[in-house]
Amino acid sequence: MQQNQYIQEIQAQAPHFVCKEVGSDTLLVPLRNNVADFNQYLTLNELGSFIYLLITEGNNFEQIHAAILANYEVNPDEASQDLNAFIELLYKYTVGNG
């Protein structure tokens, strides 16, 4: 599955990013020379933060999907589609900034 390859590449880039909580959102901020670059950041809602944490903990697509179904009231197909879209967004943001 291509998504698991994307997840592995996002995991490899994780040390180059920092998460900063701002209100109910989390900012995913790239590090440049070990300094947070607040000119470029991705805002994550609660579910996005949950997924990013699961990715950085080494989980694969199937494990993340199962965790979403266990913690949120959502249709499995909808969760899969939304997870696919979010992984692609994270991949473009993290690998593109890496």
Language-model features: where?
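Long, low-complexity, charged/polar intrinsically disordered regions in eukaryotic proteins
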Residues: 1-36
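Long, charge-rich, low-complexity alpha-helical segments
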Residues: 2-3, 34-98
